[in-house]
Amino acid sequence: MTEQQSTRAQIKQSRHQAILEALATQLEQHPGQRITTAQLAESLGVSEAALYRHFPSKARMFEGLIEFSEDTVFGLIRRIVDEDDNAVSRCEKIMALMLGFSAKNPGISSVLVGTALTGETERLRHRVSQFFDRLETQFRQILRERELTLTQAGGRPVNETANLLLSIVEGRLQQFVRSGFRQSPLQGWEQQWQLINTILKVYA
């Protein structure tokens, strides 16, 4: 790739990012409302045609936000798993990571809980479902691996525990979005974790 081609690629990438950031901002500023491409273009000071030069459809813009979430969250989860070998601590850090990511990205949170996808293609809801399925699988894998190392292996409700942890995360995100982003998903988290920790003692 020549220097000129590299520069063009960087400019294209920065414009992609600017569009996605603008969409996330619009979702944050107008909770519960459907964001149109005309509205998005106006916020960026460009034409709708300019948007479509970078994204073939609004659905692809939403997919871009979901992909950003996947890359960010699961990249950090890999780091947690690599650096911490304690199963309970891993679960705590992953849950806190998800809640913190949500708090920092209100607009994206509305995509992940599905409220921003009303009237959009079913493919997007499937992508979001895959995101949370993957998160639950991560919890399940951590707990299963820990169970296999315990003296009295077996008998622990690994699947149910993983699903409970996921449900707590999803519930906090739902509350955050439903409150119009006023109730932080991290509100009261330290106290709530102490309660969750009592459930996970069987994996300690």
What are these regions (language model features)?
Residues 27, 32-33, 53, 82, ...:
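Helix-turn-helix/winged-helix DNA-binding modules
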Residues 71-74, 122-148, 159-163, 187-197:
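Amphipathic alpha-helical packing segments from all-alpha helical-bundle domains
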Residues 1-43, 60:
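Basic, helix-initiating cap at the start of DNA-binding domains
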Residues 27, 62-69:
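Alpha-helical DNA-contacting segments of helix-turn-helix folds
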Residues 45-55, 61:
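Short hydrophobic/aromatic patch on the recognition helix
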Residues 100-104, 108, 141, 162-183, ...:
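Amphipathic C-terminal alpha-helical segment
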Residues 64, 78-104, 158-165:
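Hydrophobic alpha-helical connector segments
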Residues 103-126, 174:
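Amphipathic alpha-helical segments used for helix-helix packing
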